[in-house]
Amino acid sequence: MAAALQTNIRPVKFPATLRALTKQSSPAPFRVRCAAASPGKKRYNITLLPGDGIGPEVISIAKNVLQQAGSLEGLEFSFQEMPVGGAALDLVGVPLPEETVSAAKESDAVLLGAIGGYKWDKNEKHLKPETGLLQLRAGLKVFANLRPATVLPQLVDASTLKREVAEGVDLMVVRELTGGIYFGVPRGIKTNENGEEVGYNTEVYAAHEIDRIARVAFETARKRRGKLCSVDKANVLDASILWRRRVTALAAEYPDVELSHMYVDNAAMQLVRDPKQFDTIVTNNIFGDILSDEASMITGSIGMLPSASLSDSGPGLFEPIHGSAPDIAGQDKANPLATILSAAMLLKYGLGEEKAAKRIEDAVLGALNKGFRTGDIYSAGTKLVGCKEMGEEVLKSVDSHVQASV
């Protein structure tokens, strides 16, 4: 069985302002919760984790967009901002305070900015910002990571692939997040009988772990174009033989979804040769880690890519895939679109509010259609803008809600 990650979350004494925040009331945790609100409106509690580097900048903008799109669709949001990562280390000495975990668990969804920075690189492992993120995922029991990779027509020339290969790419990688070789036991480094050091890890998957990620993938494919490719290494690995067997058996419950199988080495090649053949990909932890990063580069900029991590019943964790970019933090240079699109995923996959999610997605396309670009996606003939102005343009498009061309 996959070993559980030790959280080592410690209670800390917050400054008065943060203690006041943690006293806000929230409903008991379960998937897609809705508290009482104004007549005709639904209310959701959202925990915001700005984190480090450019995180606070992009979270501030995404919050405004989320609030505006929600209000236009009859939704009300109550936001609670909590520290995590390096910001929490500086504030209270640990990367994930117990109060942050409690707030996240009691919310309907969690929106994260970014984690990490040079400042904390030399910290011991348990005091690194990234440890806080791993602990948060473990605390929320998220097991399914959804990462879309879409080449928008406005940005097709930013892709490293030829236009005819990149144009029209729209795929989703569904990665199992808590099992496999990253968590399997036994693991370690030891000295063998010859006195030589040996490092070893174990790829382990139980049937229920495969079944639950496969269900997420089938449901995701059903909402997209109805095609699911399961990626494994069943010609070599026993764990992959079981993976393929379980996914194939589950396909009987989804006759409307076309299932195919592909070995991971071939999948890695096909992603750059003909990425348009893929709709939804489901795979294990380590293969998903690699393939999702590969797929992200097809789009041309990680500043455009959101992600969602889902659990069986509790709140999901939504975040851009880019890092904290401390070298541009506070300079109004960050691209907020990945975080804005993460807010759209929060609405769609976390709360089931697809109309509000579509409003945000259309607004992003609307701003791009008008030619606005941050530095990472800028090209000749477009208008270079900063983080704040890009956010303002998306907000304008949310208000107008003109169906954007794709």
UniProtKB/Swiss-Prot annotation:
SMART domains: Iso_dh. GO terms for cellular component: chloroplast. Its main location: plastid. Residues 1-34 form a transit peptide. Substrate binds at residues 137, 147, 175, 265. NAD(+) binds at residues 117-130, 323-335. Its cofactor is Mg(2+); Mn(2+). Binds 1 Mg(2+) or Mn(2+) ion per subunit. One of its GO terms (biological process) is L-leucine biosynthetic process. The record marks 182, 233 as: Important for catalysis. Pathway: Amino-acid biosynthesis; L-leucine biosynthesis; L-leucine from 3-methyl-2-oxobutanoate: step 3/4. Homodimer. HAMAP family: LeuB_type1. NCBIfam families: leuB. This is 3-isopropylmalate dehydrogenase, chloroplastic. It comes from Brassica napus. The lineage of its organism: Eukaryota, Viridiplantae, Streptophyta, Embryophyta, Tracheophyta.
